[in-house]
Amino acid sequence: MPLGTWWRGDPLPDLSPLQTFSASLSTDTQMIARLANLSEQEINTRIQTGNHPYIAFLDDAPVAYGWVALREGGISELQFSFTIPPRNGYLWDFLTLPQWRGRGIYPRLLQAIIHQEQLVDHFWIGYQPGNEASAHGINKAGFHVVGDLVISEGRLRGLALFGSSGRAQASADFFHLPIVAGK
């Protein structure tokens, strides 16, 4: 699973305007539950545990959502969890509704979150290997891929870093993972 980061002060690429696009932190638990196909109880639990839900709109239609974790993050498929240090945010559980894909909503939602979460200096995000749409949207939003989770025999073994930058090392520290290889 490739991991990317964006740090406050990094440039954000200019994205062409998308008419009527808006995105904001949401308190509408019913709408979030409907979009994410989760119970309102699950949405409330996420919010109470330090997760911020964002919804993107075109006109008044909700078209995408995503979450920012500020206390604890995790990758449920790997049974992996981690504590998030202050001034860091982990971006997770994003979805653009199928009928709205291919319009550049995802990178705009990521940038909107960066603009609105002013208390976060370092944003972290991962995506499934082979998910080229996510990889493209994350890159287009201005994130840099710095490492890849190393999984063998169904277990998370550590992190392979892409290069020797301070950000690559910071990713190992953020996720509390050993460095098992460099690429």
Task: Give residue ranges: language-model regions.
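Conserved GNAT acetyl-CoA-binding A-motif
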Residues: 117-129
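Acyl-donor-binding surface of acyltransferase catalytic domains
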Residues: 1-43
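Conserved acyl-donor/pantetheine-binding loop and adjacent beta-alpha core of acyl/acetyltransferases
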Residues: 45, 49-53, 57-89, 93
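Conserved catalytic-core motifs of GNAT/GCN5-like acyltransferases
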Residues: 1-5, 144-159
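Conserved active-site alpha-helix within GNAT-family acetyltransferase domains
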Residues: 129-149
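Short low-complexity, flexible loop/linker segments enriched in glycine and/or proline
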Residues: 160-164
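Conserved acetyl-CoA-binding loop-helix of GNAT-fold acetyltransferases
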Residues: 93-116, 135-136, 140
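Intrinsically disordered, low-complexity, positively biased terminal segments
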Residues: 1-16, 115, 121, 169-183
